[in-house]
Design a protein with these regions (language model features):
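Mid-domain, small-residue-enriched loop/turn segments at the edges of structured enzyme/sensor domains
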Residues: 6-66
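Structured C-terminal helix/loop/strand segments within mature extracytoplasmic catalytic/sensor domains
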Residues: 11-13, 63-166
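Acidic/histidine-rich, surface-exposed loop or edge segments in extracytoplasmic proteins
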Residues: 1-2, 136
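Extracytoplasmic
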Residues: 3, 26, 47, 52, ...
């Protein structure tokens, strides 16, 4: 939830927040926020200066699962434990959604705001484990939050995708 993330970053403060993002090597690590708005602490990751690709998201998840982020073992375990889990064709899927909107200035389109949805996490089935990052950007205006839709489609497709990778 956005408000909760903003409360955490406020409590961390600018220097500690920027330090963690840098130590985590999270995306482009730019937490400055929107130019002239002094909002990096509460908005840098919301369609602003902090950017990350699907590949970088998957690498981050791999590091989380391997306990390789610069935090305690307890912090790794707690983070893994609080992510929601879902079932999909025998797979147990753990992940987090994200939704934002891309406007004309960001995507250079004339169709107004478009919804962007993430679903990032990992899945286990028997002895197999995978990490994933699914990013979907609507091709036209949409008022529906894209993150939950992205998750639903991914969960439906996962069994077939995983079978093809064998």
């Amino acid at each position: 939830m956005l408000w909760f993330s903003q409360e955490i970053t406020r409590r961390l403060g600018n220097e500690r927040f920027a330090g963690y993002v840098s130590k985590f090597d999270y995306g482009n690590t730019d937490v400055a926020g929107n130019a002239g708005k002094n909002d990096g602490l509460t908005r840098s990751w919301v369609n602003s200066s902090l950017e990350i690709s699907p590949v970088e998201q998957a690498i981050f998840m791999r590091r989380l699962l391997a306990g390789e982020l610069p935090v305690s073992d307890k912090a790794h375990a707690m983070t893994r434990a609080i992510l929601p889990s879902f079932r999909a064709g025998g797979w147990t899927v753990h992940g987090k959604t994200g939704t934002t909107r891309l406007g004309d200035s960001a995507d250079k389109r004339s169709d107004g705001w478009r919804s962007l949805g993430w679903f990032v996490g990992w899945a286990n089935k028997d002895s197999r484990s995978i990490v994933f990052a699914r990013l979907v950007i609507d091709t036209k205006r949409s008022d529906t939050p894209k993150g939950p839709q992205t998750r639903a489609v991914f969960l439906k497709e996962l069994p077939n995708l995983a079978d093809k990778s064998n």
